[in-house]
Amino acid sequence: MRDIVFVSPQLYLSSQEGWKSDSAKSGFIPILKNDLQRFQDSLKHIVDARNSLSETLLNSNDDGSIHNSDQNTGLNKDKEASIADNNSANKCATSSSRYQELKQFLPISLDQQIHTVSLQGVSSSFSRGQIESLLDHCLNLALTETQSNSALKVEAWSSFSSFLDTQDIFIRFSKVDEDEAFVNTLNYCKALFAFIRKLHEDFKIELHLDLNTKEYVEDRTGTIPSVKPEKASEFYSVFKNIEDQTDERNSKKEQLDDSSTQYKVDTNTLSDLPSDALDQLCKDIIEFRTKVVSIEKEKKMKSTYEESRRQRHQMQKVFDQIRKNHSGAKGSANTEEEDTNMEDEDEEDDTEDDLALEKRKEERDLEESNRRYEDMLHQLHSNTEPKIKSIRADIMSAENYEEHLEKNRSLYLKELLHLANDVHYDHHRSFKEQEERRDEEDRAKNGNAKELAPIQLSDGKAISAGKAAAITLPEGTVKSENYNADKNVSESSEHVKIKFDFKKAIDHSVESSSEDEGYRESELPPTKPSERSAAEDRLPFTADELNIRLTNLKESRYVDELVREFLGVYEDELVEYILENIRVNQSKQALLNELRETFDEDGETIADRLWSRKEFRLGT
């Protein structure tokens, strides 16, 4: 009973004292004392949500009272303000569910095609609600500035994104009896966007009209309305507010994504495990969960990219259909003209033929231009966009490099210690330093070979000092040769150096080396053949004898230790492969060729060590 405590969730949620007790009470539930913190954490988010809801209600009540007071003080408005209020009311009444998918947005009549425009350069991070709010404000401002009380409104809109930072917004206005209101609205919006682009470089929105819509507007355009700077500043401030909200939402989303990877393992659920294994187990759990979250993010990005590509394909089909219809209408018109002109004179026929050829040439040029455009578009989607995404990912990774390195430090150390089995990994980094140190010891002990002067023998032959020291001669001969050598050295100081012929120098060096070898062989004691090591290329053993020796070598686990020394881990398959290679080929060179593919330069060291084992020596 000492490990049990009684708690009341109702009292805890109402922030009352006495919500926990050591004795049983009515309405209290028993839990372990170790689970008390978990109980508080599970109910904490409920309390936080309730507090945030209360604050929201208080703020909304305050805003409502302020709004009512503003309405009471602003009853008297001029004609311009009343028009804006009426248009705002109309927009609010129709602002819901105006977005349509791209395939549903396709215009089915000429009126719908004329009343359809597009906005280019809108940020891809804008939500549908933010886009509708921006469109409503722009339309209200245009109707107010053009002094129009028309019922013009946004009937539907759609969007098309090429998976870059911007998207295209297609807008279809409702058809009204007053064509002047529609024309003036488009002219004012176009002038407004152009005016803001001159003042602010970050504003990229531009109004684009189709050819039919452009001709329709130009035929009915009277005086182009002027844009007031204060109205342009007002619209730009609305645009910046929406952009700031988008940035804040994106930052919150990034924080949420980061929090999804910042996972903490509850050690209370792992209480039955030894404490020395908890740290590594927690790291493995966090690593696994982070990997799963990353995979889910990649799947989501891939699905988004597939949806964008499907939209592009659908839009391309729509454009192809419109192009075919337009080409068919041109072809039928050309056919009728040719039939009519068949009855004219020969000169007129020749002129018409030239005109048809010119039209066909223009059509071919148009098709070629469209083909180049499609190729460039394909190049953009297949090469440019993936490169941009990859560069952005590299930039983000480089910006957070130290944080990522510190977070995964234990994983990188583990990989460095246990998984460093790359074929190009250098396992003997200090080999050069060891060789240099041994060379210095040899020079200190025996002297520098380059500085030793050649010694002149009695017969006139030159021999190096190192070879002369290794030769053992009778006492009298040594004395006479030393006397001759001293004499020659003294005489050489008085005469210039003689340049020997190249061939004679080679002959002398060969003779001196042969004499040196003869003296050394005479001094070395004879060795028994049974004690010589089988260091030749091929092993002089029968198959049965070789199998016995390989079995002894395998039981000694010498090959296993060699593999572990150069790879860092035990590899049973590699050990079996090495032994099988020796059994089949019985050749050191064949084994060396195979080991170089795995151990690179260390393969020669491994082969030398194996061939120097007692199992491969004769007489053992």
UniProtKB/Swiss-Prot annotation:
Component of the 18S U1 snRNP particle, a subcomplex of the spliceosome. GO terms for biological process: mRNA 5'-splice site recognition; mRNA splicing, via spliceosome. Its main location: cytoplasm. One of its GO terms (cellular component) is spliceosomal complex. Gene3D superfamilies: PWI domain. It holds the Pfam family SNU71_N. It comes from Saccharomyces cerevisiae (strain ATCC 204508 / S288c). Residues 59-75, 258-270 have a biased composition (Polar residues). The modification Phosphoserine is found at residues 512, 514. This is U1 small nuclear ribonucleoprotein component SNU71.
